C-alpha cells in the first residue's frame, strides 16, 4: 500500500468523524531507560551473587543459572546502549501509527505504518491489542477486520508475506473479498 498523504487522512477524518480512530504508539525514552537501568541493576546483583556462589562451590545448576543471568545482563546492557542512541531522536518517539474505522458489526484496521528502527518495541502489535480491546471487546463487536493483504503468500521472500504472518499471529484467517476502490462524490 502506498502512503496517500496528509490531505487524504484529513478528508477521511472529516468524512467518518468519530468512526475514524487514529492511534499512535510512542516510546517515552526517559521512562524506558530508567526501567532498563533498574532491570540491569537487578540482573547485575543476581550475576554477582551467582558468581560468588559458583566460585565458592561450583555446581552444574549454579553454572547454568550464572550463564543464563549473564546473557540476560548482556541483553539488558545492549538495550541500554540502543536506548542511548534512540534518545538522540528526542524524548517521545512515535514508533507506529494506525487508522481504524468502526462499523456496527466490525472494526476495520485500514492503514498503518511503523518506524523500522523501533520495530523491536512491537509498537504495531501494541496498537492492535489496544484497538481490539477498546474498539471491539468493549463495544461488543465480534469481528476485527485486518483488511488488506497482497503478494504471493507461498513465497517466503514476498513483501506481503510478512504482513500476512503478522496478521495471522493474531489468529487471523484470510477471507478473500473483491478489493478496494475510490468512489468520487
Regions found by a protein language model. Give the residues of each.
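Generic hydrophobic alpha-helical scaffold/packing signal
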Residues: 98, 132-133, 164, 168
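Conserved acyl-CoA
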Residues: 129-143
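Alpha-helical elements of Rossmann-like donor-binding domains used by nucleotide-donor carbohydrate transfer enzymes
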Residues: 7-11, 127-131, 162
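A conserved beta-strand-loop-helix scaffold within acyl/acetyltransferase catalytic domains
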Residues: 1-120
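Short, contiguous acidic/charged loop-to-helix segments that flank catalytic cores in large enzymes
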Residues: 114-122, 151-158
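Conserved acetyl-CoA-binding loop-helix of GNAT-fold acetyltransferases
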Residues: 119-133
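Flexible, glycine- and charge-enriched loops at secondary-structure boundaries
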Residues: 2, 121, 125, 160
Amino acid at each position: 500500500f502506498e502512503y496517500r498523504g496528509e490531505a487524504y487522512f484529513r478528508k477521511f477524518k472529516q468524512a467518518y468523524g468519530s468512526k475514524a480512530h487514529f492511534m499512535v504508539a510512542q516510546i517515552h525514552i526517559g521512562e524506558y531507560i530508567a526501567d532498563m537501568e533498574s532491570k540491569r541493576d537487578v540482573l547485575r546483583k543476581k550475576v554477582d551473587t551467582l558468581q560468588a556462589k559458583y566460585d565458592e562451590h561450583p555446581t552444574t545448576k549454579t553454572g547454568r543459572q550464572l550463564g543464563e543471568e549473564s546473557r540476560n545482563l548482556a541483553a539488558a546492557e545492549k538495550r541500554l546502549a540502543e536506548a542511548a542512541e534512540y534518545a538522540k531522536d528526542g524524548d517521545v518517539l512515535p514508533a507506529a501509527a494506525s487508522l481504524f474505522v468502526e462499523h456496527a458489526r466490525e472494526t476495520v484496521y485500514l492503514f498503518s505504518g511503523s518506524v523500522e528502527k523501533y520495530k523491536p518495541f512491537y509498537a504495531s502489535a501494541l496498537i492492535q491489542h489496544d484497538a481490539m480491546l477498546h474498539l471491539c471487546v468493549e463495544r461488543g463487536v465480534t469481528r476485527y477486520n485486518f483488511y488488506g493483504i497482497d503478494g504471493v503468500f507461498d513465497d517466503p521472500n514476498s513483501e506481503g508475506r510478512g504482513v500476512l504472518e503478522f496478521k495471522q499471529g493474531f489468529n487471523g484467517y484470510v477471507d478473500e473479498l473483491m478489493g478496494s476502490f475510490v468512489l468520487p462524490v
